[in-house]
Amino acid sequence: MQFSKMHGLGNDFMVVDAVTQNVFFSPELIRRLADRHLGVGFDQLLVVEPPYDPELDFHYRIFNADGSEVAQCGNGARCFARFVRLKGLTNKRDIRVSTANGRMVLTVTDDDLVRVNMGEPNFEPSAVPFRANKAEKTYIMRAAEQTILCGVVSMGNPHCVIQVDDVDTAAVETLGPVLESHERFPERANIGFMQVVKREHIRLRVYERGAGETQACGSGACAAVAVGIQQGLLAEEVRVELPGGRLDIAWKGPGHPLYMTGPAVHVYDGFIHL
C-alpha cells in the first residue's frame, strides 16, 4: 500500500489514496500503523475515497491513532487538499469534500496555504454532544477535584475550551484526559487550553480525543476562537499560536461559516506491506 506522511504544524498524518488503491483499515491495523516505534507513526490516518455525490470531488475519512473514526480534523483537511493535488487526483483549487457529518470546501491559495470553510460553530449542547439543561456561554464542571469554567462547541466534532492564564503551565497532561472522558461528554471531547494574549491573538494547547496532546489541532483552534468570540473575549480575526506554529481563524459570528487558514507539508512517500 502506498501512502504519504504529511503534517499540519506538527500534527502528523498518514495519508492514503483509496481512489486508486483497494484498502481496508481495521482498528487493530490502524493502531499498529500509528505506533511510532513499530509502525509508521501518526496522530491521525486520513483516507481519500471517491465521492458519494457527483457534486463533490472526494469523501474524507479520519481515524485517530487509537483506531476510532472521527468526523472532523482541521489540520488533516489542509493536508488532504495538498495531497489530492500533489498526487494528481485533481487540479482544482477549490476542492469539495464530504465527511462523516457534512461537507467542506478546501481552497488552496496562491501562496500554497490552505483555507478551509469549517462551517458554522454549533453551540447547542445536543449537537456537541454535551449533557446540559440548556445552552450557556459558560458552563461549570467538576473534574479532578476542581471547579472548571468552560465553553463547549461542535466544529463537527466535540470541543471543550478552558481559559487559562498561561498555557505553558496549564495542566494539559493531567486535566486533559479527565475532561476528555468526562461523563458530560458521552462521545468524549477535545480539550482546549486557551490563553488570551489580546483580542486578535491567543495561545493554545489541545488534548485531542483519542490522540492526546498534539502539536496543533485545527478544529481545536477554530473552537477556541468561536468560544472566545461568543464570550466577548476575541475579535473576528484571530491569530492562534500553537506549539507547532500559527493558524489564522476568521468568524463573523452566528449565521456565518468559520474559516481556518494555515500550512500543510508533505514529508515523504512510502510503501508498506500489510
From Swiss-Prot:
Its main location: cytoplasm. Substrate binds at N11, Q44, N64, G74, N75, N157, N190, E208, R209, G218, S219. GO terms for molecular function: diaminopimelate epimerase activity; enzyme activator activity; protein homodimerization activity. It catalyses: (2S,6S)-2,6-diaminopimelate = meso-2,6-diaminopimelate. Inhibited by 2-(4-amino-4-carboxybutyl)aziri-dine-2-carboxylate (aziDAP) and iodoacetamide. It is found in: Cytoplasm. The record marks Y268 as: Important for dimerization. The keyword Repressor does not apply. The record marks H159, E208 as: Could be important to modulate the pK values of the two catalytic cysteine residues. Homodimer. Involved in the succinylase branch of the L-lysine biosynthesis and in the biosynthesis of the pentapeptide incorporated in the peptidoglycan moiety. Catalyzes the stereoinversion of LL-2,6-diaminopimelate (L,L-DAP) to meso-diaminopimelate (meso-DAP). NCBIfam families: DapF. DapF utilizes a two-base mechanism involving a pair of cysteine residues (Cys-73 and Cys-217). This is Diaminopimelate epimerase. The lineage of its organism: Bacteria, Pseudomonadati, Pseudomonadota, Gammaproteobacteria, Enterobacterales.
